[in-house]
Amino acid sequence: MAIFGLQIVISLIVFCFLTKLTKYYSFGRWLLCKGLYHYWPPTNEEFKQAIKQRYAKESNNKSKKQSNILKSYHKTSTINNNNDSSNTKEEFPIPIDTSIELKLIPVTHQDVIQVKYIDEFFSLVDFITGSIIIFILTELYLYIMPIIRQNNEHLNEINLSLFWCFISLLLALIILTKFVREYLKVDEGILCILFGALSFLLALCLQYIDEKFFDFNLKQTYGNHSIIYNDDNDEEINYIDRRFIYIVMLLSLINAYQTIILFFPAFRFGQLQYLFLLKNKNLNKKNFKNIFIFILIIINFILPIFTCLLWFKPIIQHININYLIKLKILSIIICILLRICLFKFYIQIYLDTAYDRVKILYEQQQLTTTRITNLSYQRNVTSIFFYLGVVTSQYILPVFIELIICFYLKIFSFKNSNLSINSLKPPKWLQNFDNYMTNTTNTNSSLILTWNDLHTFFNNQHITVLLSYVLFWHHTIFCLISCGSLIYNTYIQREQHITVKND
């Protein structure tokens, strides 16, 4: 209690409260199960009814052909009904001019609980939300208590929110790694490995030119130079400590891992951005709400690109270091909040792709001799909904990871390297409260000394440089891949349009 003080009480109370609250109100359920709609295909009976209505509209001179076709449908239907005992699914072709309407129904919790990875999404979003609340309360506590105690020094406490943020970060990385493992089972996994290897080489290049163009300060912090003169003592030769090379290799491996887990989330984000631009282009009615959302989504995509420029030395060379760190954290948090606020719009754009898939099916049927069956129709529509757990996790988890890295950067950037052991005496009533909570703070002062020794060996500057570099890579690689995805989808759509026009 002497190390964590009142923080552990706040943490336990908040988590107990949130555990009880999630039964009635969940931030994850609110994000996904309120205000969103998804398409659902007709049943087999509705398909048959639509086919009958289609043939009933034909002329009388084709009545014989109609009866033969209807008999064939009834025949296949009876055969498949007889085979239902052997667990075979009923399948029949659908004519191209059959009038079929997709059902647009709201997304409910009862529907999404059968979706894969949706339980992980709900539990992880709620846990990370609790960790964020604990971090904010802890920061308020550590800011207010020195004012109450009439002491400007830091408290004799270790920030407990670091522990909860670390657990949240670890769980998010586990889920994204699980997605990569699923991709590796198919051909798409090769892209993750390829871009991971390219990012490893790119990270090596960036870390060796950081002093000229980038504000990483890796060489200044970890690169101990040794000056050796040649035989004539007229020329100096600088050698960098070997430990710096090990750190460079370790950071490059971390960057490669970041790229691997962020490739498909960033690529999908760029794809959703393209779908939104395409939808807005074809939108006939444009009111104030649509224009406002369009501006927000454009800002959401462009603002992170300008945030990456805060690590370029030619731009920030005249800015104070403390203000620069605050500006980096503030700008990234604005990007994160904007992306969370636009969560429903992006997910709704994804759910609307079920309607586009049906249009593509009919276009393929017109160009080729393949025929649409009821199973292929249903499969193309329902696959969008059943992949919702992966899409939502890929959208929200990189945002939370970046937010947690910002929290760590804030804690280690604006904090003294040593924790004070002897501080000024607070007021009597507050001192009695402290004695009751901590049972005298001197009992565990040896642990605080150990914490201070660790800080002298590996101080806040070392940690801040690492966190700033990891944050830069996470933010920049996500922007680069999403921009590449937007360009790729635009090019593919243009090529398909040219091909259809030529045909």
PLM regions and their residue ranges:
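Membrane-interface amphipathic/juxtamembrane segments adjacent to transmembrane helices
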Residues: S26-K75
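Short, non-transmembrane cytosolic segments of multipass membrane proteins
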Residues: N68-T88
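Alpha-helical transmembrane segments of secretory-pathway, organelle, and plasma-membrane proteins
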Residues: M1-N44, D97-Y183, D187, L191-D503
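Charge-dense, helix-prone N-terminal extensions
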Residues: T88-T98
